[in-house]
């Protein structure tokens, strides 16, 4: 049985998304009877490095035989690209023009492989600079954070621009979180990575974008019959009807 798939491609914020309360785990639970949610998160990665591993993350054999195009791929990079070039994480920094070019190339790669696949971009989140100093990375003796909220904002704007130019849906996470006055403490556990509340926002925003492109529990059929589709007097009968029965009509709420 080949279930349709949704891929999550990104950095540590994606890699951690299958942890308890993570947005990826929530997506997997949400689509548990309709699609497989596949994690492809790589801590510390930027778009430059993502470009180098595209053919390994999405190998050619995915197109062979009964391979189906993914329903959707989320592309969630930028937090590391936006590292400042004169601080401890300079090796992760990618200039903003190159970041935009790389996002364009990633979207083009995926759409050329699978024209029907929905590619959803997600901007980097905001940065709580005070919290970053409390959770130092490398620059133990520095009073300067390796990331700033201004830089994150610029990369988020660039991501939104690329999405518009590509005609792709986008979750503007930077702007969404800024709608709440206590976003730093509420949504970022260390000034960068997500709290449970932050994961909830990403989940809700991604679900919303998936619905906009027609991917929801209402539109995707269930993989196998639900128990309330079964006749208590002849429960096996439903399996004979599998090729024609739309099981999502019978789902237990």
Predicted regions mapped to residue ranges:
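Conserved catalytic region of serine esterases and O-acyltransferases that act on ester linkages
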Residues: 2-3, 69, 122, 161, ...
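Substrate-gating cap/lid alpha-helix
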Residues: 129-173, 196-200
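Surface-exposed, active-site-proximal loop segments in enzymatic domains
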Residues: 83-93, 130-140, 185-187
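Alpha-helical structural signal in soluble globular domains
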Residues: 26-30, 109, 113, 158-166, ...
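Generic structural signal for helix capping and beta-alpha/helix-loop junctions
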Residues: 16, 47, 129, 178-180
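Short, well-ordered beta-to-alpha junction loops that form the rim of enzyme active sites
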Residues: 123-126, 173-175
